[in-house]
């Protein structure tokens, strides 16, 4: 967080605890206010009290009731209205839970004015892992329409959920949409690229601790689980890929391939649904092999538990931009990794 602050990055906070952590980075309340958004549309009283004490930046509302809640405590920092936008096709859509419908925005604005609550702008989120990047353009247009009755400078929060694989395309789409906005409309554009920043920040290295024959290929157990670093699978609908690190004997013998066949990776817990991945084209593994899972920084450690008494893995920090040479001898990851559908949240 210190590095981010030094780089001029602001903080999108969801709770009182996150506000406390962010506030500790700043020398003055005014600097903290200018660098934060309390972006949870539904806040408990204790967190609102923390935000007022710390003098956070604006919060977010998506209902008349939330505006009334703020007015009751004499909230002074202003609010952004979170609007519901098209997030169909995103890996993690949010509009079923968050966001005001277009028809409800005028009522929120009217109630806010009558209660002395300043509306400072609009926020939206097209869903994490957005697959249709044109949704950003449509959401920006909707945000501008929602701002139409307002006067003075406004904030538009573009949301987050940016994936490393599509970030540059998403950024280009957003930039083109912003360029089309008349310069006479004074807007401060902000976004929440937390996933993008965190994704490549951490790799996971895990040993294979078990192997046995199954009805269709091998069944392997690794020293991690869905309840640990792979919580990104049920909660974030991730499909992690891995690389096997070659052992010294293979490197010396220049043996670069193993047989490929169907296989399943299970986690180490006593839960039978603790399945990490399955594939019809998985390289055969052996007990003692180490697997390298790149890009395991987003929604992994933060949601990990110690279920069944298994500890969280040791964290090793490095300033190197490339992996250590010992990690560079590996086999290609499996192709066509299947989604483990029975451990995912249901999709309506």
Predicted ranges, named:
Residues 188-348:
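Charged (often Lys/Glu-rich) extended helix/loop segments that serve as interaction or gating elements
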Residues 73, 145, 151-153, 169-180, ...:
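Acidic/histidine-enriched ion/cofactor-binding microenvironments in catalytic or ligand-binding pockets
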Residues 24-34, 182-184, 245-258:
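Intrinsically disordered, low-complexity coil segments
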Residues 29-30, 52-53, 72-74, 90, ...:
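Solvent-exposed alpha-helices and their adjacent loops that cap or buttress functional pockets
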Residues 132-138, 164-174, 199-206, 210, ...:
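Short glycine/threonine-rich loop-to-helix capping motif typified by GTGT followed
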Residues 153-155, 186-190:
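Flexible, glycine/charged-enriched surface loops at secondary-structure junctions
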Residues 20-21, 88-89, 128-132, 162-167, ...:
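Flexible loop/turn segments at secondary-structure boundaries
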Residues 1-157, 167-168, 177-180:
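Active-site-proximal beta-alpha core segment in soluble small-molecule metabolic enzymes
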């Amino acid at each position: 967080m210190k590095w981010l602050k030094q780089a001029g990055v602001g903080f999108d906070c969801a709770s009182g605890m996150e506000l406390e952590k962010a506030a500790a980075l700043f020398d003055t309340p005014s600097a903290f206010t200018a660098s934060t958004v309390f972006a949870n549309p539904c806040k408990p009283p204790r967190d609102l009290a923390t935000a007022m004490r710390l003098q956070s930046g604006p919060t977010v509302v998506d209902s008349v009731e939330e505006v009334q809640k703020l007015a009751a405590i004499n909230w002074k920092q202003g609010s952004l209205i979170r609007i519901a936008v098209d997030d169909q096709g995103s890996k993690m859509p949010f509009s079923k839970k968050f966001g005001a419908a277009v028809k409800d925005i005028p009522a929120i604005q009217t109630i806010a004015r009558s209660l002395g609550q300043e509306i400072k702008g609009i926020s939206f989120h097209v869903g994490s892992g957005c697959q249709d990047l044109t949704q950003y353009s449509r959401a920006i247009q909707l945000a501008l329409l929602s701002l139409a009755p307002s006067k003075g400078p406004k904030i538009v929060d573009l949301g987050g959920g940016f994936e490393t694989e599509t970030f540059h395309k998403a950024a280009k789409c957003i930039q083109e949409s912003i360029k089309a906005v008349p310069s006479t409309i004074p807007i401060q554009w902000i976004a929440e690229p937390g996933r993008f920043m965190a994704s490549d920040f951490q790799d996971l290295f895990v040993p294979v601790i078990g192997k046995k024959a199954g009805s269709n290929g091998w069944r392997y157990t690794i020293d991690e689980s869905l309840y640990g670093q792979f919580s990104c699978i049920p909660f974030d609908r991730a499909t992690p890929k891995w690389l096997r690190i070659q052992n010294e004997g293979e490197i010396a013998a220049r043996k670069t391939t193993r047989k490929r066949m169907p296989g399943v990776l299970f986690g180490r817990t006593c839960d039978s649904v603790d399945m990490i991945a399955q594939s019809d084209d998985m390289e055969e593994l052996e007990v003692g092999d180490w697997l390298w899972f790149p890009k395991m920084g987003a929604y992994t450690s933060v949601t990990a538990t110690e279920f069944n008494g298994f500890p969280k893995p040791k964290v090793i920090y490095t300033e190197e931009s490339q992996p250590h040479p010992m990690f560079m001898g590996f086999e290609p990851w499996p192709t066509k990794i299947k989604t483990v559908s029975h451990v995912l949240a249901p999709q309506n």
